[in-house]
A protein has these predicted regions:
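A short glycine/serine-rich beta->alpha loop
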Residues: 83-88, 266-267, 377-380
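Short active-site loop at a secondary-structure junction
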Residues: 81-101
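Bacterial N-terminal signal peptides that target proteins for export
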Residues: 1-11
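A short, well-structured edge-of-sheet supersecondary motif
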Residues: 56-82, 296
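Conserved serine DD-peptidase/penicillin-binding transpeptidase domain
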Residues: 29-43, 47-50, 54-56, 105-367, ...
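Small-residue-rich helix-loop
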Residues: 79-81, 334-490
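C-terminal segment of classical bacterial N-terminal signal peptides
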Residues: 18-27
Protein backbone atom coordinates (compact mmCIF):
# COMPACT_ATOMS: atom_id res chain seq x y z
CA UNK A 1 0.00 0.00 0.00
CA UNK A 2 1.29 3.41 -0.87
CA UNK A 3 0.19 5.86 1.82
CA UNK A 4 0.72 9.55 1.29
CA UNK A 5 0.62 12.09 4.08
CA UNK A 6 0.52 15.73 3.18
CA UNK A 7 2.46 18.39 5.11
CA UNK A 8 2.91 16.26 8.21
CA UNK A 9 4.76 13.00 8.87
CA UNK A 10 2.66 10.05 9.93
CA UNK A 11 3.83 6.83 11.52
CA UNK A 12 2.12 4.11 9.57
CA UNK A 13 1.52 0.48 10.22
CA UNK A 14 -0.35 -1.43 7.55
CA UNK A 15 -1.76 -4.76 8.58
CA UNK A 16 -3.12 -7.34 6.16
CA UNK A 17 -4.86 -10.36 7.65
CA UNK A 18 -3.04 -11.08 10.90
CA UNK A 19 0.47 -10.14 9.81
CA UNK A 20 2.02 -6.77 10.40
CA UNK A 21 3.99 -5.39 7.49
CA UNK A 22 6.64 -2.71 7.40
CA UNK A 23 5.70 -1.80 3.86
CA UNK A 24 8.73 0.32 3.09
CA UNK A 25 11.02 -2.67 3.60
CA UNK A 26 9.00 -4.94 1.33
CA UNK A 27 9.04 -2.83 -1.82
CA UNK A 28 11.07 -4.14 -4.74
CA UNK A 29 11.53 -0.60 -5.91
CA UNK A 30 14.35 0.86 -3.90
CA UNK A 31 13.97 3.78 -1.54
CA UNK A 32 16.29 6.75 -1.63
CA UNK A 33 18.91 7.45 0.99
CA UNK A 34 21.43 10.27 1.14
CA UNK A 35 25.00 9.00 1.13
CA UNK A 36 27.62 10.44 3.47
CA UNK A 37 29.43 13.39 1.98
CA UNK A 38 32.80 12.30 0.63
CA UNK A 39 35.58 14.62 -0.42
CA UNK A 40 36.93 14.25 -3.94
CA UNK A 41 40.17 12.30 -4.06
CA UNK A 42 41.85 9.64 -6.18
CA UNK A 43 42.61 5.97 -5.74
CA UNK A 44 44.83 3.73 -7.86
CA UNK A 45 43.21 0.65 -9.38
CA UNK A 46 45.75 -1.50 -7.52
CA UNK A 47 44.44 -0.11 -4.22
CA UNK A 48 40.78 -0.69 -5.05
CA UNK A 49 40.55 -4.22 -3.64
CA UNK A 50 41.90 -3.23 -0.25
CA UNK A 51 39.61 -0.20 -0.10
CA UNK A 52 36.46 -2.19 -0.93
CA UNK A 53 37.39 -5.00 1.45
CA UNK A 54 37.73 -2.43 4.22
CA UNK A 55 34.05 -1.57 3.73
CA UNK A 56 32.51 -5.02 3.37
CA UNK A 57 34.64 -6.71 6.05
CA UNK A 58 33.43 -4.45 8.84
CA UNK A 59 32.11 -6.40 11.86
CA UNK A 60 28.72 -4.86 11.14
CA UNK A 61 28.52 -7.00 8.00
CA UNK A 62 29.92 -10.24 9.40
CA UNK A 63 26.74 -12.19 8.57
CA UNK A 64 26.04 -10.50 5.25
CA UNK A 65 26.57 -11.97 1.78
CA UNK A 66 28.20 -9.60 -0.69
CA UNK A 67 28.32 -10.11 -4.44
CA UNK A 68 30.40 -7.58 -6.37
CA UNK A 69 31.84 -7.29 -9.86
CA UNK A 70 33.60 -4.21 -11.23
CA UNK A 71 35.00 -4.08 -14.76
CA UNK A 72 35.93 -1.51 -17.39
CA UNK A 73 33.05 -1.10 -19.83
CA UNK A 74 35.34 -1.76 -22.78
CA UNK A 75 36.73 -5.10 -21.64
CA UNK A 76 36.27 -8.11 -19.39
CA UNK A 77 39.25 -7.19 -17.23
CA UNK A 78 38.23 -7.50 -13.59
CA UNK A 79 38.97 -4.60 -11.26
CA UNK A 80 37.24 -6.24 -8.31
CA UNK A 81 35.26 -9.44 -7.84
CA UNK A 82 33.62 -11.12 -4.88
CA UNK A 83 31.30 -14.08 -5.42
CA UNK A 84 30.47 -12.57 -8.79
CA UNK A 85 29.33 -15.91 -10.22
CA UNK A 86 27.18 -16.96 -7.28
CA UNK A 87 23.42 -16.53 -7.07
CA UNK A 88 21.80 -13.69 -5.16
CA UNK A 89 18.23 -12.45 -4.87
CA UNK A 90 18.52 -9.36 -7.09
CA UNK A 91 15.35 -7.43 -6.15
CA UNK A 92 14.63 -4.67 -8.68
CA UNK A 93 18.01 -4.98 -10.37
CA UNK A 94 16.20 -7.69 -12.31
CA UNK A 95 14.41 -4.93 -14.22
CA UNK A 96 17.70 -4.36 -16.03
CA UNK A 97 17.25 -7.76 -17.68
CA UNK A 98 13.58 -7.35 -18.57
CA UNK A 99 14.02 -3.90 -20.06
CA UNK A 100 17.14 -4.90 -21.99
CA UNK A 101 15.17 -7.67 -23.67
CA UNK A 102 12.17 -5.43 -24.32
CA UNK A 103 14.30 -2.76 -25.95
CA UNK A 104 16.17 -5.30 -28.06
CA UNK A 105 13.12 -7.20 -29.27
CA UNK A 106 10.41 -4.54 -29.40
CA UNK A 107 12.39 -1.42 -30.28
CA UNK A 108 12.41 2.06 -28.75
CA UNK A 109 9.33 3.17 -30.73
CA UNK A 110 7.12 0.22 -29.79
CA UNK A 111 3.70 1.21 -28.44
CA UNK A 112 0.95 -0.81 -26.79
CA UNK A 113 -2.45 -0.39 -28.44
CA UNK A 114 -5.91 -0.60 -26.88
CA UNK A 115 -8.57 -1.08 -29.56
CA UNK A 116 -12.34 -1.00 -29.93
CA UNK A 117 -13.91 -3.03 -32.74
CA UNK A 118 -17.44 -2.88 -34.13
CA UNK A 119 -18.96 -6.33 -34.46
CA UNK A 120 -22.37 -5.17 -35.70
CA UNK A 121 -25.84 -5.05 -34.14
CA UNK A 122 -24.80 -2.57 -31.46
CA UNK A 123 -22.04 -4.84 -30.15
CA UNK A 124 -18.56 -3.44 -29.56
CA UNK A 125 -15.46 -5.37 -28.58
CA UNK A 126 -12.67 -3.70 -26.61
CA UNK A 127 -9.30 -5.44 -26.70
CA UNK A 128 -6.73 -4.64 -24.04
CA UNK A 129 -3.09 -5.47 -24.59
CA UNK A 130 -1.62 -4.71 -21.18
CA UNK A 131 -0.79 -1.01 -21.53
CA UNK A 132 0.51 -0.03 -18.06
CA UNK A 133 0.13 3.69 -18.83
CA UNK A 134 -3.60 3.53 -19.61
CA UNK A 135 -5.59 5.95 -17.47
CA UNK A 136 -9.04 7.53 -17.26
CA UNK A 137 -7.78 10.18 -19.68
CA UNK A 138 -7.30 7.58 -22.41
CA UNK A 139 -10.71 6.08 -21.67
CA UNK A 140 -12.21 9.51 -22.22
CA UNK A 141 -10.38 9.71 -25.54
CA UNK A 142 -11.88 6.38 -26.59
CA UNK A 143 -15.35 7.58 -25.62
CA UNK A 144 -14.88 10.77 -27.62
CA UNK A 145 -13.78 8.78 -30.67
CA UNK A 146 -16.93 6.68 -30.43
CA UNK A 147 -19.06 9.81 -30.16
CA UNK A 148 -17.38 11.21 -33.27
CA UNK A 149 -18.39 8.01 -35.07
CA UNK A 150 -22.00 8.84 -34.27
CA UNK A 151 -22.40 6.18 -31.61
CA UNK A 152 -24.88 7.13 -28.90
CA UNK A 153 -25.83 3.68 -27.62
CA UNK A 154 -23.92 0.44 -27.07
CA UNK A 155 -26.15 -2.56 -26.50
CA UNK A 156 -23.30 -4.81 -25.47
CA UNK A 157 -19.62 -4.17 -24.76
CA UNK A 158 -17.39 -7.23 -24.83
CA UNK A 159 -14.02 -6.95 -23.10
CA UNK A 160 -11.55 -9.40 -24.62
CA UNK A 161 -8.80 -10.10 -22.07
CA UNK A 162 -7.16 -12.93 -24.02
CA UNK A 163 -4.02 -11.00 -24.93
CA UNK A 164 -2.34 -11.80 -21.61
CA UNK A 165 -2.65 -15.42 -20.53
CA UNK A 166 -2.09 -16.77 -17.03
CA UNK A 167 -2.43 -15.57 -13.45
CA UNK A 168 -2.88 -11.83 -13.00
CA UNK A 169 -0.73 -12.04 -9.85
CA UNK A 170 2.54 -13.96 -9.82
CA UNK A 171 2.01 -17.02 -7.58
CA UNK A 172 5.53 -16.67 -6.15
CA UNK A 173 4.90 -13.17 -4.77
CA UNK A 174 4.40 -12.93 -1.03
CA UNK A 175 0.94 -12.20 0.33
CA UNK A 176 1.86 -8.85 1.85
CA UNK A 177 3.28 -7.71 -1.50
CA UNK A 178 0.12 -8.70 -3.34
CA UNK A 179 -1.88 -6.50 -0.97
CA UNK A 180 0.25 -3.44 -1.73
CA UNK A 181 0.11 -1.03 -4.64
CA UNK A 182 3.55 -2.15 -5.79
CA UNK A 183 2.13 -5.67 -6.21
CA UNK A 184 -0.91 -4.72 -8.30
CA UNK A 185 -2.32 -7.36 -10.67
CA UNK A 186 -1.20 -7.44 -14.30
CA UNK A 187 -3.80 -8.23 -16.95
CA UNK A 188 -4.89 -7.22 -20.45
CA UNK A 189 -6.86 -4.25 -19.12
CA UNK A 190 -4.55 -2.30 -16.83
CA UNK A 191 -6.13 1.00 -15.80
CA UNK A 192 -4.72 3.66 -13.49
CA UNK A 193 -1.97 1.13 -12.71
CA UNK A 194 -4.72 -1.11 -11.29
CA UNK A 195 -4.83 0.98 -8.14
CA UNK A 196 -7.67 2.77 -6.39
CA UNK A 197 -7.44 5.29 -3.56
CA UNK A 198 -9.28 6.26 -0.44
CA UNK A 199 -8.68 9.23 1.83
CA UNK A 200 -8.94 9.28 5.62
CA UNK A 201 -9.94 12.68 6.98
CA UNK A 202 -9.69 13.62 10.70
CA UNK A 203 -12.87 14.86 12.38
CA UNK A 204 -13.59 16.17 15.88
CA UNK A 205 -11.81 14.41 18.74
CA UNK A 206 -13.50 11.09 19.47
CA UNK A 207 -15.15 10.83 16.06
CA UNK A 208 -14.28 8.21 13.45
CA UNK A 209 -12.07 9.28 10.57
CA UNK A 210 -14.12 10.12 7.50
CA UNK A 211 -13.51 7.70 4.64
CA UNK A 212 -13.61 9.49 1.30
CA UNK A 213 -13.44 7.38 -1.86
CA UNK A 214 -11.91 8.97 -4.92
CA UNK A 215 -13.98 6.54 -7.00
CA UNK A 216 -17.56 6.22 -5.79
CA UNK A 217 -18.06 3.21 -8.03
CA UNK A 218 -15.19 1.41 -6.35
CA UNK A 219 -16.67 2.09 -2.92
CA UNK A 220 -19.67 -0.05 -3.88
CA UNK A 221 -17.40 -3.06 -4.37
CA UNK A 222 -16.29 -3.09 -0.74
CA UNK A 223 -17.75 -3.46 2.72
CA UNK A 224 -15.83 -1.05 4.92
CA UNK A 225 -15.54 -1.52 8.67
CA UNK A 226 -14.33 1.78 10.09
CA UNK A 227 -12.88 1.40 13.59
CA UNK A 228 -10.61 4.44 13.39
CA UNK A 229 -10.75 7.49 15.62
CA UNK A 230 -9.68 11.13 15.68
CA UNK A 231 -7.47 11.99 18.67
CA UNK A 232 -6.03 15.11 20.30
CA UNK A 233 -3.02 16.88 18.85
CA UNK A 234 -0.53 15.47 21.35
CA UNK A 235 -1.35 11.84 20.49
CA UNK A 236 0.59 9.59 18.05
CA UNK A 237 -0.84 8.90 14.60
CA UNK A 238 -1.01 5.50 12.93
CA UNK A 239 -3.28 3.67 10.54
CA UNK A 240 -4.08 -0.04 10.36
CA UNK A 241 -5.71 -1.34 7.17
CA UNK A 242 -6.96 -4.91 7.11
CA UNK A 243 -8.03 -6.50 3.86
CA UNK A 244 -9.56 -9.95 3.93
CA UNK A 245 -8.45 -12.65 1.55
CA UNK A 246 -11.78 -12.52 -0.27
CA UNK A 247 -10.98 -8.95 -1.27
CA UNK A 248 -14.41 -7.60 -0.31
CA UNK A 249 -13.87 -6.29 3.22
CA UNK A 250 -11.66 -3.39 4.30
CA UNK A 251 -11.14 -2.86 8.00
CA UNK A 252 -9.75 0.55 8.94
CA UNK A 253 -8.24 0.97 12.39
CA UNK A 254 -5.90 3.43 14.06
CA UNK A 255 -5.92 7.13 14.73
CA UNK A 256 -5.03 10.54 13.32
CA UNK A 257 -4.73 13.75 15.29
CA UNK A 258 -7.41 16.35 14.78
CA UNK A 259 -4.93 18.73 13.14
CA UNK A 260 -3.53 16.10 10.75
CA UNK A 261 -3.72 16.46 7.01
CA UNK A 262 -5.79 13.76 5.29
CA UNK A 263 -3.96 10.54 4.50
CA UNK A 264 -4.28 8.95 1.06
CA UNK A 265 -4.11 5.16 0.84
CA UNK A 266 -3.59 3.34 -2.46
CA UNK A 267 -4.77 -0.25 -2.81
CA UNK A 268 -4.64 -2.71 -5.72
CA UNK A 269 -7.92 -3.54 -7.43
CA UNK A 270 -9.00 -7.16 -7.12
CA UNK A 271 -11.14 -7.36 -10.27
CA UNK A 272 -9.18 -5.37 -12.88
CA UNK A 273 -11.32 -6.34 -15.88
CA UNK A 274 -14.51 -5.15 -14.24
CA UNK A 275 -12.75 -2.13 -12.77
CA UNK A 276 -11.88 -1.17 -16.37
CA UNK A 277 -15.49 -1.67 -17.48
CA UNK A 278 -16.88 0.37 -14.58
CA UNK A 279 -14.55 3.26 -15.34
CA UNK A 280 -15.25 3.04 -19.08
CA UNK A 281 -19.00 3.17 -18.43
CA UNK A 282 -18.41 6.43 -16.56
CA UNK A 283 -16.33 7.82 -19.44
CA UNK A 284 -19.03 6.90 -21.95
CA UNK A 285 -21.70 8.56 -19.82
CA UNK A 286 -19.83 11.87 -19.90
CA UNK A 287 -20.09 11.70 -23.71
CA UNK A 288 -23.81 10.85 -23.43
CA UNK A 289 -23.29 7.32 -24.72
CA UNK A 290 -25.49 4.77 -22.99
CA UNK A 291 -24.03 1.37 -22.27
CA UNK A 292 -26.08 -1.77 -21.81
CA UNK A 293 -24.62 -5.16 -20.99
CA UNK A 294 -20.90 -5.69 -20.37
CA UNK A 295 -19.16 -9.02 -20.68
CA UNK A 296 -15.60 -10.30 -20.23
CA UNK A 297 -14.47 -13.02 -22.62
CA UNK A 298 -11.22 -14.76 -23.46
CA UNK A 299 -10.81 -14.65 -27.21
CA UNK A 300 -13.01 -13.93 -30.20
CA UNK A 301 -12.89 -12.36 -33.64
CA UNK A 302 -12.15 -8.67 -34.09
CA UNK A 303 -13.76 -6.92 -37.03
CA UNK A 304 -13.56 -3.20 -37.87
CA UNK A 305 -11.43 -1.08 -35.54
CA UNK A 306 -13.32 2.14 -34.85
CA UNK A 307 -11.35 3.60 -31.94
CA UNK A 308 -7.93 3.15 -30.35
CA UNK A 309 -5.39 4.70 -28.01
CA UNK A 310 -1.69 3.92 -27.73
CA UNK A 311 0.86 4.04 -24.97
CA UNK A 312 3.88 6.33 -25.11
CA UNK A 313 6.83 4.77 -26.95
CA UNK A 314 8.82 2.08 -25.21
CA UNK A 315 11.66 4.55 -24.64
CA UNK A 316 9.34 6.47 -22.28
CA UNK A 317 7.91 3.35 -20.67
CA UNK A 318 11.47 2.31 -19.85
CA UNK A 319 12.07 5.55 -17.97
CA UNK A 320 9.11 4.92 -15.68
CA UNK A 321 10.16 1.29 -15.27
CA UNK A 322 13.79 1.95 -14.37
CA UNK A 323 13.93 5.46 -12.93
CA UNK A 324 10.94 4.93 -10.63
CA UNK A 325 11.36 1.15 -10.36
CA UNK A 326 7.75 0.55 -11.36
CA UNK A 327 6.90 -3.13 -10.89
CA UNK A 328 3.67 -2.99 -12.88
CA UNK A 329 5.44 -1.50 -15.90
CA UNK A 330 8.17 -4.14 -15.77
CA UNK A 331 5.63 -6.94 -15.59
CA UNK A 332 3.63 -5.42 -18.45
CA UNK A 333 6.77 -5.24 -20.61
CA UNK A 334 7.51 -8.90 -19.88
CA UNK A 335 4.04 -9.77 -21.15
CA UNK A 336 4.44 -7.46 -24.14
CA UNK A 337 7.41 -9.60 -25.15
CA UNK A 338 5.09 -12.61 -25.09
CA UNK A 339 2.48 -10.78 -27.14
CA UNK A 340 4.88 -10.55 -30.05
CA UNK A 341 5.48 -14.31 -30.06
CA UNK A 342 3.31 -17.17 -31.37
CA UNK A 343 0.84 -18.27 -28.72
CA UNK A 344 1.40 -21.63 -27.04
CA UNK A 345 -1.67 -23.04 -25.31
CA UNK A 346 0.33 -24.76 -22.58
CA UNK A 347 2.33 -21.64 -21.66
CA UNK A 348 1.38 -18.43 -19.90
CA UNK A 349 2.42 -14.98 -21.08
CA UNK A 350 5.01 -14.92 -18.29
CA UNK A 351 6.46 -18.23 -19.50
CA UNK A 352 6.78 -16.98 -23.07
CA UNK A 353 8.06 -13.59 -21.94
CA UNK A 354 10.79 -15.15 -19.82
CA UNK A 355 11.84 -17.31 -22.76
CA UNK A 356 12.11 -14.14 -24.84
CA UNK A 357 14.21 -12.50 -22.14
CA UNK A 358 16.55 -15.49 -22.10
CA UNK A 359 16.93 -15.46 -25.88
CA UNK A 360 17.63 -11.73 -25.93
CA UNK A 361 20.16 -11.88 -23.09
CA UNK A 362 21.96 -14.78 -24.74
CA UNK A 363 22.34 -12.67 -27.89
CA UNK A 364 23.85 -9.93 -25.72
CA UNK A 365 26.45 -12.35 -24.38
CA UNK A 366 24.86 -13.07 -21.01
CA UNK A 367 25.46 -16.61 -19.77
CA UNK A 368 22.03 -18.27 -19.18
CA UNK A 369 23.53 -20.07 -16.18
CA UNK A 370 23.91 -16.68 -14.49
CA UNK A 371 20.22 -16.21 -13.69
CA UNK A 372 16.93 -17.92 -12.84
CA UNK A 373 13.91 -15.69 -13.41
CA UNK A 374 10.28 -16.11 -12.38
CA UNK A 375 8.96 -12.57 -12.93
CA UNK A 376 9.84 -9.36 -14.72
CA UNK A 377 10.10 -6.93 -11.82
CA UNK A 378 12.25 -8.62 -9.19
CA UNK A 379 9.50 -8.70 -6.58
CA UNK A 380 9.69 -12.48 -6.21
CA UNK A 381 12.26 -13.96 -3.86
CA UNK A 382 12.60 -16.94 -6.18
CA UNK A 383 14.52 -14.84 -8.69
CA UNK A 384 18.25 -15.53 -8.63
CA UNK A 385 21.03 -13.77 -10.52
CA UNK A 386 24.77 -13.29 -10.30
CA UNK A 387 26.54 -9.92 -10.31
CA UNK A 388 28.17 -11.15 -13.52
CA UNK A 389 24.74 -11.39 -15.18
CA UNK A 390 24.14 -7.68 -14.66
CA UNK A 391 27.63 -6.66 -15.75
CA UNK A 392 27.28 -8.77 -18.90
CA UNK A 393 23.87 -7.24 -19.62
CA UNK A 394 25.04 -3.67 -19.07
CA UNK A 395 28.09 -4.19 -21.26
CA UNK A 396 26.10 -5.97 -23.94
CA UNK A 397 23.50 -3.22 -24.10
CA UNK A 398 26.18 -0.53 -24.32
CA UNK A 399 27.32 -2.12 -27.59
CA UNK A 400 23.87 -2.05 -29.21
CA UNK A 401 22.38 0.81 -31.27
CA UNK A 402 19.73 1.28 -28.58
CA UNK A 403 22.29 1.37 -25.79
CA UNK A 404 21.90 5.11 -25.33
CA UNK A 405 18.14 4.73 -24.80
CA UNK A 406 18.74 2.03 -22.22
CA UNK A 407 21.31 4.06 -20.33
CA UNK A 408 19.22 7.23 -20.46
CA UNK A 409 16.39 5.34 -18.75
CA UNK A 410 18.42 4.71 -15.59
CA UNK A 411 18.37 6.73 -12.37
CA UNK A 412 21.21 9.24 -12.07
CA UNK A 413 23.15 9.68 -8.83
CA UNK A 414 21.94 12.73 -6.94
CA UNK A 415 19.75 13.83 -9.84
CA UNK A 416 17.00 11.54 -11.12
CA UNK A 417 14.74 8.71 -10.01
CA UNK A 418 15.48 6.41 -7.09
CA UNK A 419 19.05 7.77 -6.91
CA UNK A 420 17.96 11.39 -6.61
CA UNK A 421 18.45 11.41 -2.85
CA UNK A 422 21.70 9.46 -2.90
CA UNK A 423 25.29 10.55 -3.67
CA UNK A 424 24.51 14.23 -3.33
CA UNK A 425 27.65 16.31 -2.72
CA UNK A 426 29.92 13.36 -3.57
CA UNK A 427 32.21 12.63 -6.49
CA UNK A 428 29.54 10.22 -7.78
CA UNK A 429 26.86 12.87 -8.26
CA UNK A 430 25.78 13.11 -11.88
CA UNK A 431 28.24 10.51 -13.24
CA UNK A 432 26.65 7.27 -12.01
CA UNK A 433 23.67 5.78 -13.85
CA UNK A 434 22.44 2.71 -12.03
CA UNK A 435 19.43 0.61 -11.07
CA UNK A 436 18.50 0.28 -7.43
CA UNK A 437 16.88 -2.68 -5.72
CA UNK A 438 15.43 -3.33 -2.27
CA UNK A 439 13.63 -6.17 -0.51
CA UNK A 440 13.81 -7.10 3.15
CA UNK A 441 17.42 -8.23 3.69
CA UNK A 442 18.32 -7.38 0.08
CA UNK A 443 19.88 -4.24 -1.39
CA UNK A 444 21.39 -3.99 -4.86
CA UNK A 445 22.86 -1.45 -7.25
CA UNK A 446 24.13 -2.09 -10.78
CA UNK A 447 25.05 0.33 -13.52
CA UNK A 448 27.54 2.56 -15.29
CA UNK A 449 30.11 5.06 -14.03
CA UNK A 450 31.77 7.77 -16.12
CA UNK A 451 34.90 7.91 -13.96
CA UNK A 452 36.57 11.28 -14.67
CA UNK A 453 40.15 9.99 -14.22
CA UNK A 454 39.57 6.50 -15.54
CA UNK A 455 37.72 4.84 -18.39
CA UNK A 456 33.96 4.12 -18.12
CA UNK A 457 33.15 1.41 -15.59
CA UNK A 458 30.35 -1.13 -15.27
CA UNK A 459 29.53 -2.61 -11.86
CA UNK A 460 27.09 -4.70 -9.87
CA UNK A 461 26.82 -4.82 -6.08
CA UNK A 462 24.27 -7.09 -4.38
CA UNK A 463 23.79 -7.65 -0.65
CA UNK A 464 21.74 -10.60 0.62
CA UNK A 465 20.82 -12.22 3.94
CA UNK A 466 21.30 -9.07 5.94
CA UNK A 467 19.79 -8.22 9.28
CA UNK A 468 20.96 -4.63 8.94
CA UNK A 469 18.57 -1.81 7.99
CA UNK A 470 18.51 -1.04 4.28
CA UNK A 471 19.80 2.46 5.01
CA UNK A 472 23.01 1.03 6.47
CA UNK A 473 23.53 -1.27 3.50
CA UNK A 474 22.95 1.56 1.02
CA UNK A 475 25.49 3.74 2.77
CA UNK A 476 28.09 0.98 2.45
CA UNK A 477 27.25 0.41 -1.21
CA UNK A 478 27.45 4.14 -1.82
CA UNK A 479 30.89 4.26 -0.22
CA UNK A 480 32.07 1.60 -2.66
CA UNK A 481 30.58 3.41 -5.64
CA UNK A 482 32.22 6.68 -4.59
CA UNK A 483 35.54 4.81 -4.49
CA UNK A 484 34.93 3.67 -8.07
CA UNK A 485 34.33 7.24 -9.21
CA UNK A 486 37.73 8.18 -7.78
CA UNK A 487 39.67 5.57 -9.75
CA UNK A 488 42.71 6.66 -11.70
CA UNK A 489 45.56 4.90 -13.46
CA UNK A 490 48.76 4.97 -11.43
Amino acid sequence: VRLKIFNQPLGVLLIFLTSQIGFSSRVAKAQTQVAPTTSTKSICSTQLGTAIDAVINRPLFSRVRWGILVQPLSSGQTLYSRDAQKYFIPASNLKLLTTAAALQQLGANFRIRTSIYQNGNGVLRVVGRGDPSLSDTQLQTLAQQLKQKGITQIQRLIADDSYIQGDIVNPTWQWEDVQSDYGAPVNSFILNQNIFSLKLVPQAVGKSLQVVWTDVGEAKQWRTINQSVTVAQNQPSYINVTRELSGTVLRIQGQLTTNSEPSLIDLPVVDPNYYFLRRFRTALATEKITLGQTLVVNGGVNQEEIAFVESPPLSELLMETLQNSNNLYAEALLRALAGEKPRVKTKTSVDVGLEAVKASLTQLGVDPANYILVDGSGLSRRNLATPEAFVQTLRGMARTPAGYVYRASLPVAGKIGTLKGRFQNTSAEGIVQAKTGTLTGVVSLSGYINAPKYEPIVFSIIVNQSEQPATILRQAIDEIVVLLTQLQRC
